[in-house]
Amino acid sequence: MHPVVSEKRQGERVSMIITAVAVGTRGDVNPLAELGEEMIRRGHGFRILTSEAFRTLIESKGVTFIKLDTDADHVMKYLVTDYKTSLDFAKGMFRLKKENPGFMEQTLNAIKGSDLVMYGTCAAFARHAAEYLNIPCARIFYSPMDPTRQYSLYSDEYDSDKVLKSYDGLPQGMSLMTMIALNGWRCSVGLPRWRISSRYTEMNGRKVLTFYPTSKVLMPPDPAWGDPIHVTGYWYHPEEAAGDYEEPKELTDFLGSGKKPVFVAFGKAESPELARLQLLTLDALKRTGIRAIVQAFQITEKERVNTDKLFFIDAVPYPYIFEKVRAVVHHGGNTTNGMGLRAGLPTLVIALALDQYFYGRMDNRIGCGPEPLYIRKKLCSTDEIAGALEDLVSGRYDAKARDISRMIREENGVVTAADSIEKYVSE
């Protein structure tokens, strides 16, 4: 058992300190802030090491913010937007480390005194800092990384040996990235070199706690996984997220002037592909005449012309706007996808990355939306997007989306995760 920070008790629980390391977008940070709020409610300490861009979000939940000296958009460009192969990812991680030589020192300082270190794929360097300080770890994934026959990022099939085989190169790929990016640091602090046979699934002879903060409806856990791998449900409280948002009069007028619109949002990552996708989607909306509210961060002022069919908007709380629309079109990010499904909305995913395409496939598989489009796998044309939009609003997905909404609302991801953390750390 790892020693706890203090003997202060709340009921039967022993107080602990957890440090999460997050590199990525709001979708990577917000679930951790929600989990942190739950852990603090239970009497534990929770802190998040991440970009300055997320300070306000984190501190609004009462969670301790620790600054990681990196720019969130810059990180996303190297580790997500430009990521097409494992080698690209390794190059991005290596370049990021080269441009931010204090990464590991910052991480070591942030996690000292912790009882558990949590990290996602883009922050896998935190695992090595935790190993150096002999602190247990928890991995956080938003798409399947543990082998299963049921589904895979790398196969369009389901429930087959081919699906299971698609995972074969994944551990070696992660090890290769690590060898390129971190073996120099590991040797400098006296840790053994990471090898191609090394695995992230265990540390110091113990299996690493693993979380998938997504719905079991979309991603049923493989019974063969066992402990300590958990598909928990989403980590957020959507009913609290709208806050004191005041609807602009122009939006109120648009909503009241015709049929319920769809909501279109593709995130903020800087990418030529994203800019092209937004323009194609606008052309498809104009061609079909479908009313839409469009959150467009890469559309120029010249193109942002409100009409009786299109309304452009910047930041807006998703739980709020999802109550006002009939369907949603987005890039397939785990949190955005979950919020839309929880709201009972038919969903069309036009993905920029493989994990997003996976969730689009899952949405389609459970009957909540059309087959997804993937800008890197198919030549996304105006015709393809227009056809998918018309299918989305045809009504064929409405009843199933409402059924799935009820199932997702029965899950409580933050409570499930918090219970698992307390059990794991106390063992």
Can you say where each PLM-predicted feature lies in the sequence?
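General beta-strand structural signal in soluble alpha/beta enzymes
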Residues: 48, 119, 294-295, 330
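Nucleotide-activated sugar donor-binding and catalytic core shared by glycosyltransferases
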Residues: 7-9, 16-49, 53-65, 88, ...
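Nucleotide-sugar-dependent glycosyltransferase catalytic domains
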Residues: 41, 52-261, 268, 273-279, ...
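Acidic/polar loop patches that form or flank catalytic/metal-binding clefts of enzymes
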Residues: 69, 294, 398
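Cofactor-binding loop segments of dinucleotide-utilizing enzymes, especially the Rossmann-like FAD-
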Residues: 23, 51, 142, 234, ...
